[in-house]
């Protein structure tokens, strides 16, 4: 994606299932911390606004700290939190090396030397990236079983409803943030479960110390989660640690946010991305499991691991298709093939745009995340070229000689590395005209590969959201190479609707596809439809989310995809461009063909998997119409 879109965060959980001495003898000191560092670093694409790490120790004495948390919002947050986590151990290695080798001493005296870890990578889609907003969060209590550490990759659409419920119970939340509300929600049912067990064991005549031990053994995590998550509307992977050593990770019933896990006799590990687990622990693809929608993996203090159905899975899961197009790392085996398929499937539209003239066409990609889709497009170009060679040979079979064959076999896709982002370039100028000129130089281009006024130039991008980078930078700088025509190919379909499940795309007016549809309505004398959609949206503003209809679909209904793409081309083409320009998109059908198991396509279709989605798009349109630049949730 040539435009930066902040999106869902990343989680990493590690539970050591054997005594700490086992890992020291087999792997050496700090093995768990090193694994956590790798597990988070291999997911750093999921969060660069901040990072946090929590650790729970099991066998501490009263008065000893058993939960350690560190966070950083610096420019290198992962390195910072692990520098802090390793600090005690490195100091010991310098000053008291014998203690650095004493695992029992370390557990009782050094931080981050326990059995249970939870890491978080933050991309802030809402709120500031101050330390107080970074995960993991801690709900403290003097009872071990009431301490709750929480981190998640999530966004809930009905935080306002949950807040009202807490207030009705007599609580006074000091924050309205979704994480604070969720922490309190789970914490409330954790408290209730502890109180229920306490009364039960008290009636049996047990001492308070005995009761604490029994509660730790018999805490019903399934009941806590099912009660807490009953009314949640949104996409989430919620990870939690309880002070005595239980842990859980819960995935939403639509499977919107991704989650994978791996267990053996030494460890249990959970992460947002499968390749991170495979690389960190050197395990094969077949052994890393996907946490199914609505399920929770629960790891008890005694090492028992179970996967429980907490919420009824949706009959039509809506796993996020944007994960496959852009957000997740392309090193995942399935995602790699899906991105290649997207590149192949857009090829017919690209060929049509260049009038099938591959001899006089250079193909490339921008940015680097589009490289896999480019491979697929290039393969499809090669297939087309081979078909043309076969036709030429058959057409000239009675008149073939060496020269003719050489001529035929010279037809092949011309792949070149055309654009590279200059990551060191910063824009300090504030005047719009001068700043736009500087932005146009964010990308460097390779000269001498495009024949001026002869060649077409095709570049593929993962997706096009706002179109501002295209207009201000990419089209301008590609035009300097002198192509006859510039074709921008998006491997994703047109992004038409806001997200509300963890991606920072909540304002309709930001979307180039929406602006194109609005422009077409006005040009075609149909501006009244905009007013009508506003009236309908405003009329249902205060209805329950379950009753709200997505009327924004009516904005797009009068036009074909090609008409909207044509208007997008006009909107992203700057003045004084010499080359003819065209923007082409993949279709919804192609998306589903390439990504058959991740059918969450609300960005493109407006078909939201939860009622809260319709509420958000309704609010987004009202905000747009009224000139309100606020987020829709």
What function would you assign to each model-found segment?
Residues 1-292, 298-362, 366-367:
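Conserved short alpha-helical segments that host acidic/polar catalytic motifs at enzyme active sites
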Residues 77-129, 375, 380-386, 397-448:
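Cofactor-binding active-site loop characterized by glycine-rich and histidine/acidic residues
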Residues 94-104, 200-220, 383-412, 523-536, ...:
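Short mixed-charge
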Residues 229, 244-246, 251, 263, ...:
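PRPP-dependent phosphoribosyltransferase catalytic core
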Residues 231-234, 338-359, 377-380, 430-453, ...:
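Phosphate/ATP-binding catalytic cores across multiple sugar-kinase/actin-like superfamilies
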Residues 240, 251-252, 272-274, 301, ...:
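Active-site proximal loops enriched in glycine and acidic residues that flank catalytic Cys/His/Asp
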Residues 303-320, 365-400, 404:
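Terminal amphipathic helices with adjacent charged low-complexity linkers/tails
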Residues 363, 370-377, 381, 425, ...:
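Extended, hydrophobic alpha-helical segments in both membrane/secreted and soluble proteins
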């Amino acid at each position: 994606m040539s435009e930066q879109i902040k999106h869902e965060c990343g989680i990493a959980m590690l539970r050591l299932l054997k005594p700490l001495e086992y890992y020291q003898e087999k792997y050496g000191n700090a093995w768990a911390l090193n694994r956590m560092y790798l597990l988070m670093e291999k997911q750093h694409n999921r969060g660069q606004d901040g990072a946090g790490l929590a650790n729970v120790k099991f066998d501490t004495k009263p008065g000893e700290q058993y939960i350690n948390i560190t966070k950083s919002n610096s420019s290198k947050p992962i390195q910072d939190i692990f520098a802090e986590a390793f600090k005690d151990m490195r100091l010991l290695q310098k000053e008291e090396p014998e203690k650095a080798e004493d695992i029992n001493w370390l557990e009782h005296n050094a931080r981050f030397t326990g059995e249970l870890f939870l890491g978080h990578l933050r991309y802030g889609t809402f709120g500031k990236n101050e330390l107080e907003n970074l995960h993991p969060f801690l709900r403290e209590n003097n009872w071990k079983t009431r301490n709750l550490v929480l981190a998640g990759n999530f966004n809930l659409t009905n935080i306002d409803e949950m807040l009202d419920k807490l207030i009705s119970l007599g609580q006074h939340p000091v924050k309205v943030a979704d994480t604070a509300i969720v922490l309190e929600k789970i914490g409330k049912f954790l408290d209730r479960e502890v109180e229920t067990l306490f009364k039960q064991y008290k009636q049996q005549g047990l001492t308070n110390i005995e009761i604490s031990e029994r509660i730790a053994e018999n805490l019903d995590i399934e009941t806590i989660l099912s009660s807490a998550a009953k009314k949640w509307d949104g996409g989430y992977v919620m990870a939690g640690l309880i002070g005595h050593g239980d842990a859980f990770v819960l995935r939403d019933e639509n499977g919107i946010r991704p989650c994978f896990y791996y267990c053996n006799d030494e460890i249990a590990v959970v992460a947002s991305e499968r390749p991170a687990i495979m690389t960190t622990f050197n395990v094969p693809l077949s052994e890393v499991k996907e946490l199914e929608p609505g399920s929770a993996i629960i790891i008890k203090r005694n090492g028992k691991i179970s996967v429980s159905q907490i919420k009824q899975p949706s009959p039509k899961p809506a796993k996020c298709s944007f994960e496959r197009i852009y957000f997740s790392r392309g090193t995942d085996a399935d995602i790699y093939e899906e991105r290649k398929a997207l590149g192949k499937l857009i090829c017919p539209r690209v060929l049509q745009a260049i009038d099938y003239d591959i001899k006089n066409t250079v193909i490339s990609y921008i940015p680097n995340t589009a490289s896999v889709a480019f491979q697929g497009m290039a393969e499809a170009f090669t297939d087309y070229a081979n078909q043309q060679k076969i036709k030429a040979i058959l057409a000239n079979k009675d008149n073939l000689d060496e020269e003719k064959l050489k001529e035929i076999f010279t037809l092949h896709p011309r792949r070149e590395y055309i654009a590279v982002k200059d990551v060191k370039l910063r824009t300090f100028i504030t005047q719009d005209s001068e700043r736009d000129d500087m932005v146009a130089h964010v990308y460097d281009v390779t000269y001498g590969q495009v024949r001026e006024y002869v060649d077409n130039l095709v570049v593929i991008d993962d997706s096009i959201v706002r179109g501002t980078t295209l207009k201000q930078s990419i089209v301008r700088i590609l035009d300097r190479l002198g192509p006859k025509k510039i074709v921008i190919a998006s491997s994703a379909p047109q992004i038409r609707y806001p997200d509300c499940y963890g991606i920072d795309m909540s304002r309709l007016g930001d979307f180039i596809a929406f602006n194109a549809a609005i422009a077409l309505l006005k040009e075609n004398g149909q501006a009244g439809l905009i007013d009508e959609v506003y009236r309908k949206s405003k009329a249902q503003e205060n209805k329950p989310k379950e009753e709200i209809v997505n009327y924004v679909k009516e904005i797009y209904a009068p036009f074909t995809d090609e008409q909207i793409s044509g208007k997008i081309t006009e909107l992203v083409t700057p003045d004084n461009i010499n080359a003819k320009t065209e923007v082409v998109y993949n279709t919804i059908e192609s998306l589903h063909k390439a990504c058959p198991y991740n059918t969450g396509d609300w960005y493109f279709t407006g078909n939201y998997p939860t009622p809260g989605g319709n509420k958000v798009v309704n609010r987004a349109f009202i905000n747009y119409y009224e000139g309100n630049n606020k987020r829709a949730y």
